């Protein structure tokens, strides 16, 4: 089944000190499944890598290598963002950031499980009747 993956999970595939058994399992599953992300994902992914580089936890060369490895993955970026009213409703109902609400919205629309490590988003996915990967 296709998966919705958040940026922290995808970063953990390439940054070993951020990997967990969960992210490793999702990485193996992702090799066989189509991945889906909301429009915010490229910004979050790039920002996470930039923060790691900026703090000198990764070199610029390592970050560039990660980007080279991610680009060929079949990640469907859903460019249409939900209307602000929809994001606000989900954020209010589940005490989420608008960014996390975009992942929840995508999960509810596509009915695909969400792979994330974020506690509030995991709780919201369950509460909204969506599935976790």
For each feature predicted by the language model, list its residue ranges:
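Short, well-structured N-terminal submotif of metal-dependent ribonuclease cores
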Residues: 1-40, 52-65
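Acidic, PIN/NYN-like endoribonuclease modules and their adjacent C-terminal/linker elements
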Residues: 2, 104-133
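Histidine- and aromatic-rich ligand-binding microenvironments
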Residues: 5-6, 18, 36-39, 95-97, ...
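Alpha-helix capping/helix-boundary segments
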Residues: 9-10, 41, 83, 103, ...
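Phosphate- and divalent-cation-binding pockets in alpha/beta enzyme and binding domains
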Residues: 22, 44, 86, 123-124
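Active-site-proximal, substrate-binding regions of enzyme catalytic domains
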Residues: 46-74, 86
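Active-site neighborhoods of divalent-metal-dependent phosphate/nucleic-acid chemistry enzymes
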Residues: 74-117
């Amino acid at each position: 089944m296709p998966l919705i993956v958040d940026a922290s999970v995808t970063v953990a595939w390439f940054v070993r000190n951020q990997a967990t058994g969960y992210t490793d399992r999702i990485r193996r599953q992702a090799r066989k499944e189509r991945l889906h992300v909301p429009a915010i994902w490229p910004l979050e992914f790039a920002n996470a890598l930039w923060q790691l580089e900026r703090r000198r936890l990764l070199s610029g060369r390592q970050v560039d290598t990660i980007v080279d490895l991610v680009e060929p993955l079949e990640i469907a970026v859903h460019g249409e963002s939900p209307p602000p009213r929809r994001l606000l409703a989900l954020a209010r109902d589940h005490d989420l950031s608008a960014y996390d609400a975009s992942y929840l919205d995508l999960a509810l629309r596509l009915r695909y499980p969400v792979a994330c490590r974020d506690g509030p988003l995991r709780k919201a996915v369950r509460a909204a009747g969506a599935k976790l990967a």
